[in-house]
Amino acid sequence: MNLLFKALSHPVRRRIIDMLRKGPMASGDIAAAFDMSWPTITGHLNALKEAGLVSPEREGASIRYRLEISAVEEALAFLLAMTGAQAPDEDEGTPR
């Protein structure tokens, strides 16, 4: 859990997660959205991967990253439990 929250602490990583909410993306497309060096973006992607927030899939010569929703849900459930709040029921949109 510590790796997950550490990964979420950086604004670039949160922006990458937001981009991946729309679907998987090639690493080159992710990098093109930022004015940063390739090694810096790779470092951010590796931090997200180590935290279990994204998973890479090789596609020919490129790597596509996709968001691991279960890791995001796990973090949300942890935060809700810490505050005493309840997660909404997926089927009804009401608290459990």
What residues fall within each predicted segment?
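Alpha-helical DNA-recognition elements
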Residues: 47
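Residues within the DNA-recognition helix of helix-turn-helix
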Residues: 44
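Short beta-strand "wing" residues that participate in macromolecule-binding interfaces
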Residues: 56
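Amphipathic alpha-helical dimerization/coiled-coil segments
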Residues: 22, 69-96
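N-terminal helix-turn-helix DNA-binding core of bacterial DNA-binding proteins
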Residues: 2-40, 59-72
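Glycine-centered, phosphate/nucleic-acid-interacting loop/turn motifs that mediate DNA/RNA or nucleotide
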Residues: 52
